[in-house]
Amino acid sequence: MTTANQPICPSPAKWPSPAKLNLFLYITGQRADGYHQLQTLFQFLDYGDQLTIEPRDDNQIRLLTPIAGVENEQNLIVRAAKMLQKHPGNTPVPRGADISIDKCLPMGGGLGGGSSNAATVLVALNLLWQCGLTDEQLADLGLTLGADVPVFVRGHAAFAEGIGEKLQPAEPVEKWYLVIHPGVNIPTPIIFSDPELKRNTPIRPLAALLSTPYANDCEPIARKRFREVEQALSWLLEYAPSRLTGTGACVFAEFDTESSARQVLSIAPEWLHGFVARGVNVSPLHRVRSGKIESSERR
């Protein structure tokens, strides 16, 4: 019998929760239920939040670092843990956990922070609780929490269609990015409810999309409604190809080298805050998970 907070398996406690970028995003329609249909290209960043997850033997789920403005029971971290906790699985392990988060990704930034947090919890607790679910099963669970959760669960850069749930592995070039948060948070419904949002971009095959300049159909709305986004993008575009990610508010510029990205960051105006990160096609979460499994097997 284990005691509360004692690790149940030898996996270390810290788990990455990486950011993502939408390298392009096109709205191709809207369903009767209001969900928007899209085509988008997801790539991860080697930058993000970090979760510390310690199993418990009393079936309690505790978030030790509440996020301001978000009730614990509504936090995707807690919701993901409780969803997996209730899933029937062939495991004798008590399903509880203490979870804390070192949060650096902004809310309402278009970097997928909440979805990534949920995916990290699902992937980590599936291992720690010995649930034995496949990534496909975890992705199906995650989809009920948010359309972006499955791509984080599966852990590979992907071309997404439908409402974001139809994923096809992709291999975009792993560039360096300067990501800027313009100092405003944009709730997704503000963009998707705007009557001027383009909702009829023609559906195209991935090969055609990759051979044309990338764009984001949400960008004109974000620039129109949020002066901070307009100013940040106008500044970035002086130095490199730049776009909005997701529905914003973060914007990003792409570079071939880390040094060139950092050089531009070093001259950014004081009112702009950002970071430099590498685009990666295999999620840092899955790299860490593979290492934990190999470490456990060696023991």
Swiss-Prot record:
The active site is at 20, 148. Keywords: ATP-binding, Isoprene biosynthesis, Kinase, Nucleotide-binding, Transferase. Pfam families: GHMP_kinases_C (PF08544), GHMP_kinases_N (PF00288). ATP binds at residues 106-116. It comes from the Bacteria. Its EC number is 2.7.1.148. Catalyzes the phosphorylation of the position 2 hydroxy group of 4-diphosphocytidyl-2C-methyl-D-erythritol. Belongs to the GHMP kinase family. IspE subfamily. This is 4-diphosphocytidyl-2-C-methyl-D-erythritol kinase. It comes from Yersinia pestis.
